Regions:
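Basic nucleic-acid-binding interfaces
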Residues: 1-86
């Protein structure tokens, strides 16, 4: 599972051959969560409140790049790293 971004201790990952809808996996310490790319909604799991807000903000800022990575992943191509929040 490639890490496509890392910011404030939050690792953002996409899994090859993952199922729709397009989504990302976020990991922060012992917490794990899955977020829909199109709306930034939490699909499963949980993160602390501040980490959750940061992930949603990052998704909103990078929606186009995330969808492009999802398309690459579906084709078995290498995904690109996406800059994290600063």
């Amino acid at each position: 599972m490639p890490t496509i971004s890392l910011f404030y201790g939050i690792a953002i990952q996409m899994f090859f051959e993952d199922h729709p809808p397009p989504h990302i996996h976020a990991r922060y310490n012992e917490f794990k969560a899955r977020y829909d790319i199109s709306a930034g909604n939490l699909l499963s799991g949980e993160l602390p409140r501040q980490a959750h807000r940061l992930v949603q903000e990052w998704i909103a800022l990078n929606k186009q790049a995330l969808m492009e990575n999802w398309r690459r992943m579906e084709k078995g191509e290498q995904m690109e790293y996406i800059k994290g929040l600063e």
